[in-house]
C-alpha cells in the first residue's frame, strides 16, 4: 500500500492499495475510489461520501487529474449535467469512463436516481 499527500496537505491523501485501487481520503473521510473494471479498459469512480468543501474540492480535482479522470468530469460539466465540481461531488454515485464514453449515475435535485451517457469527442 502506498500513501501520498496531495499538494503537500497533511490531511488530503491518495492511497493506492495492493489490488491497484486508488482512493481519495480527506481527513478521516474515505471520499472516493477508482478501480479498473476487470476485462475492460474502463475505469470506475465510486463516490463513497458526497461531501464538499473548497479545500477538499481543490485536492479532489488534483486527484482526478493524476488519475486521468478530470477531463471526463469537465466534459460532464461542459454538457451541463453538473454545474461545477461542487455539484459533481455532492451528487455523483458512480462514474465509468472508457476511451470514448462516460456513464454516470447520480442523484438529481429532487433526490431521484438518474443516469447519463456521454460520447466523447473522437469516437469512431
PLM ranges: what are they?
Residues 1-124:
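Terminal leader/tail segments of proteins
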Amino acid at each position: 500500500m502506498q500513501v501520498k499527500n496531495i499538494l503537500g496537505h497533511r490531511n488530503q491523501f491518495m492511497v493506492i492499495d495492493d489490488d491497484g485501487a486508488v482512493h481519495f481520503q480527506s481527513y478521516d473521510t474515505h471520499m472516493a475510489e477508482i478501480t479498473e473494471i476487470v476485462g475492460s479498459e474502463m475505469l470506475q469512480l465510486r463516490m463513497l461520501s458526497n461531501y464538499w468543501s473548497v479545500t477538499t474540492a481543490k485536492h479532489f480535482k488534483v486527484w482526478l487529474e493524476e488519475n486521468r479522470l478530470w477531463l471526463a468530469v469537465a466534459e460532464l460539466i461542459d454538457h451541463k449535467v453538473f454545474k461545477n465540481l461542487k455539484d459533481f461531488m455532492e451528487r455523483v454515485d458512480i462514474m465509468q469512463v472508457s476511451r470514448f464514453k462516460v456513464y454516470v449515475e447520480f442523484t438529481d435535485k429532487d433526490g431521484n436516481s438518474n443516469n447519463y451517457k456521454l460520447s466523447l469527442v473522437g469516437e469512431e
